[in-house]
């Protein structure tokens, strides 16, 4: 697997442990007057993307958004498990993601719309986990895969 690029940012102390995951939601109004907002909202972070904490630094900050303060951490974009058409499911292939299904009431919706995946976003298929035959709608020729966003 490729060496993952890490980004230094600041997260609430509750999330500041290795392995914690979050979806970056952008700045809150309270961030405008914060001295460390530039680090917290690092220009490399992308709204709607899922990140995983890979290491925690000792630095702690007061925070108007996070009760209990915030800590400096290193994060990497998370590997995302999703369902895609078999025709796109080739290891190390770059794809433009389009959800297979848009029915929010479907039991399989979370596989078609996992947190951190963006419609029309560019991703690399890392692993093909196998066929996905559990589609409640009966859609055929689907695979369950692990993907990572294409670095920008």
From Swiss-Prot:
Stored InterPro entries: UPF0179
Highest taxon in the source lineage: Archaea
Family stated for the protein in its record: Belongs to the UPF0179 family.
HAMAP family with a match to the protein in the record: UPF0179
Protein name: UPF0179 protein Mlab_1307
């Amino acid at each position: 697997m490729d060496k993952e690029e890490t980004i230094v940012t600041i997260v609430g102390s509750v999330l500041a442990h290795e392995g914690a995951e979050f979806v970056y939601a952008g700045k809150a109004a309270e961030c405008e007057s914060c001295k460390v907002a530039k680090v917290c909202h690092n220009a490399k972070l992308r709204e709607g993307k899922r990140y995983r904490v890979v290491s925690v630094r000792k630095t702690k900050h007061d925070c108007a958004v996070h009760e209990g303060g915030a800590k400096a951490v290193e994060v990497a974009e998370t590997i995302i498990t999703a369902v895609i058409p078999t025709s796109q499911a080739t290891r190390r292939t770059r794809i433009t993601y389009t959800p297979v299904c848009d029915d929010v009431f479907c039991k399989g919706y979370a596989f078609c719309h996992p947190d951190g995946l963006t419609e029309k976003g560019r991703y690399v298929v890392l692993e093909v986990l196998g066929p996905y035959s559990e589609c409640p709608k009966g859609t055929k020729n689907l695979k369950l895969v692990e993907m990572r966003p294409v670095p920008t």
